[in-house]
Amino acid sequence: MDTVRIAVVGAGVMGLSTAVCIFKLVPGCSITVISDKFTPETTSDVAAGMLIPPVYPDTPIHKQKQWFKDTFDHLFAIANSAEAKDAGVLLVSGWQIFQSAPTEEVPFWADVVLGFRKMTKNELKKFPQHVCGQAFTTLKCEGPTYLPWLEKRVKGSGGLVLTRRVEDLWELHPSFNIVVNCSGLGSKQLVGDMEIFPVRGQVLKVQAPWVKHFIRDGSGLTYIYPGIANVTLGGTRQKGDWNLSPNAEISKQILSRCCALEPSLRGACDIREKVGLRPSRPGVRLEKELLVQGSQRLPVVHNYGHGSGGIAMHWGTALEAARLVSECVQALRTPAPKSKL
């Protein structure tokens, strides 16, 4: 088999980054990214994009740390390059604050971010309702800028992009030899995954250019994340809620919570509401599967279910998915042993 034809289903940060990584790791393949939604209509476009990872209960910590480190290193290199502005990647310093001491004093990612330390008493004076905190510098990756940048890289490597809704992975056979499933919440219908569910997130994008430091409540529910063009204020975590329409009452609550941490936000203007549905499950699904229909076989690599950690973990999981694709390609190119009968 000469050129292996690969379809990547999904064009959020997972689909596009996985396509880029496959081009890097798997020579002699053609890649088509297929999705019914492209930027600016993906969940990744709404994501705050801060590299502060969640913890996945069903995934070993050493694996989560590797995914995060791979992602941090990749984005740090971009932040230190001439591409930073076009890719929407920047370094941001700030504080994660707690109203009671966290169970885990030092998170698993502490030595991946820059300059992680306990907050001083003087720093904590800014947050009288909080008893302790952590100061560090991390990266912010802005979906509406980063996704077109990734898409450009896919096309620049010879990849194709196709707007189409896929109802069944078998539709892609035999046009494609391997399918990579990065369909996020779409996997509920597409592959019958009953473990995946939405966690609704509502945020505000505001103009407040004087806000330079991020502030994140330790619960992860209230946060202020300054970016290139605006400041993201959040948020909500509504399990099982599929509603994509902004709720005015929730917006008022978000603004009130954020102003309690940063009173100067009372002067913020041009407030815009955004809603995204995080594709959540107990652990990321990152594995190979061989679909069989009669004598037909279709190798599939799944890479979805990152919840609130999509951008924080994307490059690490994309690299791992690309390695799995490489194994599938190798299997296709290895002739089956002939029967001696």
Swiss-Prot record:
<feature type="binding site">
    <location>
        <position position="307"/>
    </location>
    <ligand>
        <name>FAD</name>
    </ligand>
</feature>
<feature type="binding site">
    <location>
        <position position="311"/>
    </location>
    <ligand>
        <name>FAD</name>
    </ligand>
</feature>
<dbReference type="GO" id="GO:0005782">
    <property type="term" value="C:peroxisomal matrix"/>
</dbReference>
<dbReference type="GO" id="GO:0019478">
    <property type="term" value="P:D-amino acid catabolic process"/>
</dbReference>
<keyword id="KW-0963">Cytoplasm</keyword>
<dbReference type="GO" id="GO:0050877">
    <property type="term" value="P:nervous system process"/>
</dbReference>
<dbReference type="InterPro" id="IPR006076">
    <property type="entry name" value="FAD-dep_OxRdtase"/>
</dbReference>
<dbReference type="GO" id="GO:0005737">
    <property type="term" value="C:cytoplasm"/>
</dbReference>
<dbReference type="GO" id="GO:0006531">
    <property type="term" value="P:aspartate metabolic process"/>
</dbReference>
<dbReference type="GO" id="GO:0005829">
    <property type="term" value="C:cytosol"/>
</dbReference>
<feature type="binding site">
    <location>
        <position position="36"/>
    </location>
    <ligand>
        <name>FAD</name>
    </ligand>
</feature>
<feature type="short sequence motif" description="Microbody targeting signal">
    <location>
        <begin position="339"/>
        <end position="341"/>
    </location>
</feature>
<dbReference type="InterPro" id="IPR023209">
    <property type="entry name" value="DAO"/>
</dbReference>
<dbReference type="Pfam" id="PF01266">
    <property type="entry name" value="DAO"/>
</dbReference>
<dbReference type="GO" id="GO:0071949">
    <property type="term" value="F:FAD binding"/>
</dbReference>
<keyword id="KW-0274">FAD</keyword>
<dbReference type="GO" id="GO:0042445">
    <property type="term" value="P:hormone metabolic process"/>
</dbReference>
<dbReference type="GO" id="GO:0005777">
    <property type="term" value="C:peroxisome"/>
</dbReference>
<feature type="binding site">
    <location>
        <position position="43"/>
    </location>
    <ligand>
        <name>FAD</name>
    </ligand>
</feature>
<keyword id="KW-0560">Oxidoreductase</keyword>
<dbReference type="InterPro" id="IPR006181">
    <property type="entry name" value="D-amino_acid_oxidase_CS"/>
</dbReference>
<feature type="binding site">
    <location>
        <position position="44"/>
    </location>
    <ligand>
        <name>FAD</name>
    </ligand>
</feature>
<feature type="binding site">
    <location>
        <position position="50"/>
    </location>
    <ligand>
        <name>FAD</name>
    </ligand>
</feature>
<keyword id="KW-0285">Flavoprotein</keyword>
<comment type="subunit">
    <text>Homotetramer. Interacts with PEX5; the interaction is direct and required for localization of DDO to the peroxisome.</text>
</comment>
<comment type="function">
    <text>Selectively catalyzes the oxidative deamination of acidic amino acids. Suppresses the level of D-aspartate in the brain, an amino acid that can act as an agonist for glutamate receptors. Protects the organism from the toxicity of D-amino acids. May also function in the intestine.</text>
</comment>
<dbReference type="GO" id="GO:0007320">
    <property type="term" value="P:insemination"/>
</dbReference>
<dbReference type="GO" id="GO:0010646">
    <property type="term" value="P:regulation of cell communication"/>
</dbReference>
<protein>
    <recommendedName>
        <fullName>D-aspartate oxidase</fullName>
        <ecNumber>1.4.3.1</ecNumber>
    </recommendedName>
</protein>
<comment type="similarity">
    <text>Belongs to the DAMOX/DASOX family.</text>
</comment>
<dbReference type="GO" id="GO:0007625">
    <property type="term" value="P:grooming behavior"/>
</dbReference>
<keyword id="KW-0576">Peroxisome</keyword>
<dbReference type="GO" id="GO:0047821">
    <property type="term" value="F:D-glutamate oxidase activity"/>
</dbReference>
<dbReference type="GO" id="GO:0008445">
    <property type="term" value="F:D-aspartate oxidase activity"/>
</dbReference>
<feature type="binding site">
    <location>
        <position position="37"/>
    </location>
    <ligand>
        <name>FAD</name>
    </ligand>
</feature>
